[in-house]
Amino acid sequence: MENSWHIHLIRSRRRSVGIRIEDSGEITVRAPLRMPEREIRQVLESKRSWIEKTLAKISSRPQLPKLTAEEVNALADRALKEIPPRVAARAKQMGVTYGRITIRNQKTRWGSCSAKGNLNFNCLLMLCPEDVLDYVIVHELCHRKELNHSPRFWAEVAKVLPDYKQSLKWLKTEGQTIIGQIQN
């Protein structure tokens, strides 16, 4: 196994091995309590190509300065002012209802929608282009019709934003650079 990999092993009651690569390049491996280390190494070896590709992608990303707590709070305040009216307008356009709107500082999600219709949005959306912000809002509101990512769900997104794939691509390529600005 590659010596330059920084691996953090967490044992838990899970049934399978999970691998997560942090922006720092640290690899977090979650494995069943009784799984032998040999088997964990085999899983890592089988995922070597993906791990190396992901690590290369991380190291090639531009390193933006970390946001201070004050800057994150300012983004959250701005998001609290700007996102709810946009959600209300899109919900009316789409004919859907929703519950509470919460603004959070998250490292893994841009938005989410609960089964009760409560919406969560990442304050870092304030650093994204407007069309990307609109895409995330529409994406979450479409979950009010389809609480999954089935073809029907994506058809709902496309009805409202026919070119949504451009915003989705932007999030996948540029989003991690923005999320990388959060202090650990």
Label each region the model flagged.
Residues 1-135, 144-184:
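Active-site-proximal or metal-binding-adjacent scaffold patches in catalytic folds
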Residues 140:
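Walker B catalytic acidic pair
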